[in-house]
Amino acid sequence: MPFSLIRCPVSALCAALILALSLTDIGRCASPEKAPSPSPVVRYALPFDVLQKPYVFAGETIPLQRSDVRYRITAQINFLLLDARSVLIEWLKLHESRGWLLKQLLEKEGVPDEFALFAAVLPGMVKGNQKVSYAGLWFLDKPCQKDEGVEMEDDAWRDDRMDIQLATRCFASRIKSLRSQVKGEGWLMAAAAYVGGAAAIKDAQIKWDSTSFWDIPLPLATEQLIARWIALTIINAHRQFYDINIPRQAPLVFEQLVGIRLTRDLSIGQIAQFLGLPAREVLAINPKIKANNPIFPAKVGTRIVTHTIQTPKGKGALLMEKLRQAGYLMENQAGK
């Protein structure tokens, strides 16, 4: 079989990143970097069932019996529901359509499924790292290499950091590596290291002689983002309690043509003509292709490139037939 049909969400990663950056802007305006009041007045509290029994998150029991821990999480719940509610709703809608895939990929890589919502808070990293060129759902600073378990590229025509499947595998590899470096009971310190840097976290652990996220004073942005991630997860699991009503979102799907080898360069515009679709829609389904050079090249130098091309649901077979008729397909396809 030269192609396979894979159920994947068309999450339009560019749109997701715009939403994410909106959350960052709101946070910048609504969360002044000052010490919280010791006696906060909040509108939204933690659900009773969360407080009633030990709350385990990403392999770690959160010490909610401590008032300071409750405050840090409750403050972020109120921030999301009061200051960032519209963006929160959009993120939960996106999670409805693509969350299943992220959880599936993370589980396969041995990473807790709570990380499926971690991407929503990552734009907060950008504030303190303006010189770093982040990209994709997981805000990867650079593509993974072969020794990290997944080989990715960022070249003239593609950036694999924008591919949801490759990027998630890359993120999983890196978060597992960070966990082995910073230790800790669960995964919170690894997440903090992903946000704030492993060196800073290890230095803080040595300085404070602890591996507990809740016991070590960390940079405010790091503390807020991890608490926001937990808050977002609690809200998602208790939508009725927080009066969050989201119409059921059907998983958006696309098909993948795997192992495609071309006789000549194939442009996004040509694919759009074959399928009778706007070129913008085809590009959104293939987000790793760069908009300033929107092609699937037949060769890079003298090397034949093997492609995975994504189409809307029900269009995979049509595109294969059109490519055959137009003489785009090499006789020996990688999938055969």
Please provide the spans of the model-predicted regions.
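Substrate-binding/active-site groove segments that recognize
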Residues: 133-155, 168-171, 175, 203
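Second-shell loop/turn segments in exported
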Residues: 78-92, 102-108, 126-135, 153-166, ...
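Catalytic and binding regions of secreted/periplasmic enzymes and modules that target cell-wall glycans
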Residues: 172-206
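An acidic, Gly/Ser/Thr/Pro-rich helix-cap/linker signature
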Residues: 25-110
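Short, functionally critical alpha-helical segments immediately adjacent to catalytic or ligand/cofactor-binding
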Residues: 111-127, 190-196, 282-285
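Extracellular LysM carbohydrate-binding repeats and other cell-envelope/extracellular binding modules
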Residues: 136, 218, 281, 285-335
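Bacterial N-terminal signal peptides
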Residues: 11-22
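Primarily a LysM-type cell-wall glycan-binding module
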Residues: 247-276, 334-336
